[in-house]
């Protein structure tokens, strides 16, 4: 099992589909990384040599923000929105949809379980 950016990749998958197991790397980014390092998409994770794993790790470390650093940055960005008191920050603080979705009937995921307001 190859360990890339602190994540154990599944050894039987093709490397282009295994790299997205790292938070912050999707399929497109995975292909860009493999092109830059010069590794075939068809190669399986268990077929990678130590040098190839090291090259992928080095390229990711130098060019991308992944895993803990990226999670921390996203959390800090959301906290900054809440601190400055902008509309998006208020929506985050209240636990409501941030991107303009309707909330009269939907948004159950963000709002949580329905609370009935009693009628007389």
Swiss-Prot record:
UniProt entry keywords in alphabetical sequence: Ribonucleoprotein, Ribosomal protein, RNA-binding, rRNA-binding, tRNA-binding
GO biological process per UniProt: translation
Cross-referenced InterPro entries: Rbsml_uS13_C, Ribosomal_uS13, Ribosomal_uS13-like_H2TH, Ribosomal_uS13_bac-type, Ribosomal_uS13_CS
A Pfam entry, by short name: Ribosomal_S13
GO molecular function, one term: rRNA binding
Region (Disordered): 97-120
One GO cellular component, as annotated: cytosol
NCBIfam families: uS13_bact
Family: Belongs to the universal ribosomal protein uS13 family.
Quaternary structure (record): Part of the 30S ribosomal subunit. Forms a loose heterodimer with protein S19. Forms two bridges to the 50S subunit in the 70S ribosome.
Described purpose of this protein according to its UniProt entry: Located at the top of the head of the 30S subunit, it contacts several helices of the 16S rRNA. In the 70S ribosome it contacts the 23S rRNA (bridge B1a) and protein L5 of the 50S subunit (bridge B1b), connecting the 2 subunits; these bridges are implicated in subunit movement. Contacts the tRNAs in the A and P-sites.
Name by which UniProt lists this protein: Small ribosomal subunit protein uS13
Organism encoding this protein: Nitratiruptor sp. (strain SB155-2)
Biological classification of the source: Bacteria, Pseudomonadati, Campylobacterota, Epsilonproteobacteria, Nautiliales
Gene this protein is translated from: rpsM
């Amino acid at each position: 099992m190859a360990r890339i950016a602190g994540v154990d990749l599944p050894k039987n998958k093709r490397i282009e589909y295994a790299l997205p197991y790292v938070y912050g790397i999707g399929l497109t980014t995975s292909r860009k990384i493999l092109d830059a390092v010069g590794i075939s998409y068809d190669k399986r994770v268990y077929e990678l040599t130590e040098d190839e794993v090291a090259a992928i790790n080095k390229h990711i470390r130098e060019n991308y923000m992944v895993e803990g650093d990226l999670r921390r940055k996203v959390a800090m960005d959301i906290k900054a929105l809440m601190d400055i008191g902008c509309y998006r920050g208020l929506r985050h603080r209240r636990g409501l949809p941030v991107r303009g979705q309707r909330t009269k009937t939907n948004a159950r995921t963000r709002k949580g379980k329905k609370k009935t307001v009693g009628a007389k």
